[in-house]
Structure formats: C-alpha cells, structure tokens
Amino acid sequence: MSRVGKMPIAIPAGVTVTVTPENVVTVKGPKGELVKAMHKDINIAVEDAQVVVTRPSDVKEHRALHGLTRALLNNMVVGVSQGFSKTLELNGVGYRAQLQGKKLVMNLGYSHPVEVEAVDGVDFKLDGTTKVIVEGIDKEKVGAVAANIRSWRKPEPYKGKGIKYSDEVIRRKEGKTGK
C-alpha cells in the first residue's frame, strides 16, 4: 500500500467533493471551485466527510498513481478551504515591484521594466516594494507563477542579488582574494 495513498482526506466544513463516473473531481469551498480529471484506473470514493483513494492492483503504474492522486486531491481540498501562497523577496540596488491593476511591474536592473500578468485564479500582493506575495487556490498555478517571476533574476551566489523565495537559503561563495 502507498503510504500517502492509503491515508483518507478529511473534508473540512464548508467544502464539498463530488466525483463523476469518468473520475472528474469537483471540489467547492469558501475560496472557490477546482475541477480536475483524475486517472480512470484509480477509484475515488467520498465516505462520511472524507475522501478515500484506492487502486485496483499492485501494478507499478497503479502504485505510482495512488499516492499522486491522493496528493492532488488533498491539494485541491486545502486550496479551496485555506488557499496557497508563495512569498518572493527582491534583493538588489533599485530592485522594486509595483502593482498596476492585475499586472505586476518590476524594476530588476534591465533597460525596461518587467511585467508579469496575473493568471486566472492567481493574485499578487505587495508587502512594501521588495516583497511580492503570490496567492491562489491552485497550488500548481501559484508555484508556476512564482517560479516564472523568480526566473527573471535568479539569486546570484556572491552578493545574493536577485529574486528569491522567502524561505530559500542562498549558498554564498567567497569572492576572489587579492594578492
């Protein structure tokens, strides 16, 4: 049995989970609604305020899909009830971020400002001018947008300049030593 897959998912109050015969799962909650098509071989059942994921056999593919499906469902339930967020920090002289409507505009030392559009279901918040908070109900989208923003200026190892996640630790290098 998959260690992750065998754990049932508790459905919090205010969240409803429905599964169609084609394994399309709809999760509705206070923050919104998520719909995802799961693999047809995995069995998903909603039993008294919890979701149970089972697999038909011990074939390698089914074992892999068992834990994956359970993790995806759990992320959907957590997303519609609490939401997900990633915090990015801009480190560097003149590095700033500002919001223009739903668009994030950043000055990152290029000859032009960098603009990032908010994807559906993802919002930006600013904490000062050097902290960007990416929020949403879909963990995959939040992570992808945050990674896209970080890719504009990855942190460099000498001065730590660039865009980093707030919980990321940058391995620093020693500079050249003079004679």
UniProtKB/Swiss-Prot annotation:
Which PROSITE patterns does this entry report, sorted A to Z?
Answer: RIBOSOMAL_L6_1
Q: Which residues form a coiled coil?
A: none
Task: Give one Pfam family, short name only.
Answer: Ribosomal_L6
Q: Name one GO molecular function term.
A: structural constituent of ribosome
Q: Which InterPro entries match?
A: Ribosomal_uL6-like, Ribosomal_uL6-like_a/b-dom_sf, Ribosomal_uL6_a/b-dom, Ribosomal_uL6_bac-type, Ribosomal_uL6_CS
Q: Which GO terms describe its biological process?
A: cytoplasmic translation
Entry keyword rRNA-binding: yes
- Superkingdom assignment: Bacteria
Give a Gene Ontology cellular component term annotated to this protein: cytosolic large ribosomal subunit
Task: Give the record's keywords alphabetically.
Answer: Ribonucleoprotein, Ribosomal protein, RNA-binding, rRNA-binding
Entry function: This protein binds to the 23S rRNA, and is important in its secondary structure. It is located near the subunit interface in the base of the L7/L12 stalk, and near the tRNA binding site of the peptidyltransferase center.
Protein name from the UniProt record: Large ribosomal subunit protein uL6
